[in-house]
Amino acid sequence: QVMPFMEVYERSVCQTREMLVSILDEYPSEVAHLFRPSCVTVLRCGGCCTEESLTCTATGKRSVGREIMRVDPRQGTSKIEVMQFTEHTECECRPGSTVNNGKRKKNPKEGEPR
């Protein structure tokens, strides 16, 4: 099945979208605990901008709570608690670092023998 151009375009633009984030990525100091689930959904900015020099950037944020089970394997205990996560509310394409597949773009002459 082929998705029509306008639907492809509308889905790809810079906007908030539901994404999974790892709790340990958001709370790296909590490595002594296990979390269930280990990731949560939050709205985050993502998508393509019309120019490569622009980056889809959050221009509005808020804190949202998610109930998570925190397990302490050393003590054999667990409890459900509310943890806070940053959620994006607005996005814009703004000038930013030029990134290509997670790596900085190299100057064409960089790394070449002189």
UniProtKB/Swiss-Prot annotation:
What positions are modified (Pyrrolidone carboxylic acid)? 1
Where do the record's region annotations for Disordered lie?
Answer: 92-114
Keywords per UniProt: Disulfide bond, Growth factor, Pharmaceutical, Pyrrolidone carboxylic acid, Secreted, Toxin
* Gene Ontology biological process: induction of positive chemotaxis; positive regulation of angiogenesis; positive regulation of endothelial cell proliferation; positive regulation of mast cell chemotaxis; response to hypoxia; sprouting angiogenesis; vascular endothelial growth factor receptor signaling pathway; vascular endothelial growth factor signaling pathway
- Keyword Transmembrane present in the record's keywords: the answer is no
- Record carries keyword RNA-binding: no
Q: What is its main location?
A: secreted
Q: List the disulfide bonds.
A: 14-56, 45-91, 49-93
Taxonomic superkingdom: Eukaryota
Q: Which PANTHER family match?
A: VASCULAR ENDOTHELIAL GROWTH FACTOR (PTHR12025), VASCULAR ENDOTHELIAL GROWTH FACTOR A, LONG FORM (PTHR12025:SF5)
Protein name per Swiss-Prot or TrEMBL: Snake venom vascular endothelial growth factor
Q: How does it assemble?
A: Homodimer; disulfide-linked. Interacts with human VEGF receptor 1/FLT1. Interacts with human VEGF receptor 2/KDR.
Q: Name one GO molecular function term.
A: growth factor activity
What organism is recorded for this protein?
Crotalus durissus terrificus (South American rattlesnake)
Tissue localization of expression is: Expressed by venom gland.
GO CC term, one of those recorded: membrane
**What does the protein in this record do?**
Snake venom vascular endothelial growth factor (svVEGF) that may contribute to venom dispersion and prey subjugation by inducing vascular permeability and hypotension. Induces an increase in capillary permeability after intradermal injection, as well as a drastic hypotensive effect after intravenous injection. The hypotension is mediated by nitric oxide (NO), which is produced by VEGF-activated endothelium NO synthase. Induces angiogenesis and migration of human vascular endothelial cells in vitro.
Q: Which InterPro entries match?
A: Cystine-knot_cytokine (IPR029034), PD_growth_factor_CS (IPR023581), PDGF/VEGF_dom (IPR000072), PDGF/VEGF_growth_factor (IPR050507)
From the Swiss-Prot or TrEMBL record, state where the protein is found: Secreted
Identify its protein family: Belongs to the PDGF/VEGF growth factor family. Snake venom VEGF subfamily.
